[in-house]
């Protein structure tokens, strides 16, 4: 019998456009919300065995966050540390892992810097996003390196349909932003275009000065500005024989100011991709995707050039989904990418290649479901690495499901780790091995009509952590870490009310030193509550975290905090809406990174329009 992926029209349609068309949040009674990141195939959230959080365009317009990190903060398993608001350096921790141990995809393409190993989500305009899927737990058996804590996939392409959207926002810190978007269909051709811009005078993120590497303090009593402009365009065409092909591009560029030396960064974040896919037979779907991501930062000190780091990653992926007898969906494919680095820093190597083969079998046994995955990567820097994953789910009742899984993962050393030139105080180590991890977890999902409860308990053991070895003035694989955690979520929906609560509890330990891992709060909670009253909507968000340490030695502590936001929306007419929101209503002083102040009380007003 064919797998449900091929029998269900909406799943197959989404698969034909994977990963771009999957940006649409399909939410009807029959299928529920469709996700693709957990298995690289389209499935409903109800059918997904992995812990998944989906944030749609409707969520973004309801919350109106100023940035992607602000949208992600406090979601199940996520901890955000930032050097202030408005484009300042931000670290996203998923399940207690570091920012470099979380894989970020943009429209199916690997994003981020090959030198730092992280993705600058603070530079990605939230106005360009249609959907975010957060998959928690290792996914190296599907995606390869860096998916220790999980995968965050950001989709920028709108779903089906035609129309215009526009919005303008103004508020505190001299902040203005605007967005205009259109999408449509001409015959079998779809297109979309979104432009956005944001400008903020900002605030002084380090009122007491910025410490330098020379032990001094740089005091710059000025506001730290931010500018960002972005463009996203795409087109796709569907042939009568079922084959679909298309291309799209996203580019964001701007500048951010801060205190210190250097004190300004000009940036470019760019993702370009093209794809072709379709059903070769009734039981065989194939897709080829090629793309390039770019991460460029030009650092300036008082207006003079200081350093440049430009990463370009060309990638290709060929994926095949085969429906097998016995309710099985077999996915096999090839992935490959090449990292190139162009920098004012003289790295000993400026490129490396990675090739991989992967396979996954999804088996539906009625009450029981089983997913088995295996992948082998061959990287010219550190050789071959094999990862695997096994997940089992069982329906205890019609609305109650239990899951258990075990998976392995690894993080590739960065160009800074491997190839940084010897400058006396530091040099890269070309003999590094990847960091490796083993994760086990159990979960429970209870779906009771309007209420959905999710609980997951996990343990992640990480070996060969790459840390600075002062005795050798380089980095080495010398540390081990253990992360135990519990994450829970409760959602309620009705015609008039929407409520969501998330709580994450972490116990982290560097098993070499006995210290807690830095910038990981033991408890993180987020509560959202919205009331719909005809043409009006009222809402509030409470984000709370307890204290944490800022450094690996656990000598600098950060206090816990609670931040309360309020929002109200008035539907002026079917096409027009007015929204006001107040962030940090109680004007709390708090930091998520030592010496860097988070913004105080702030207010914003948004006027939006959409065609009916």
Briefly describe each language-model feature range.
Residues 186, 218-339, 453:
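Outer-membrane beta-barrel domain signature, strongest for Gram-negative TonB-dependent receptors
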Residues 330, 364-369, 457-461, 477-553, ...:
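Gram-negative outer-membrane beta-barrel transporters
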Residues 263-279, 309-314, 380-381, 395, ...:
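Outer-membrane beta-barrel signature, preferentially recognizing the C-terminal barrel domain
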Residues 109-136:
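Short acidic/polar hinge/loop motifs at secondary-structure boundaries
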Residues 69, 73-109, 130:
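Extracytoplasmic beta-strand/coil segments of soluble accessory domains associated
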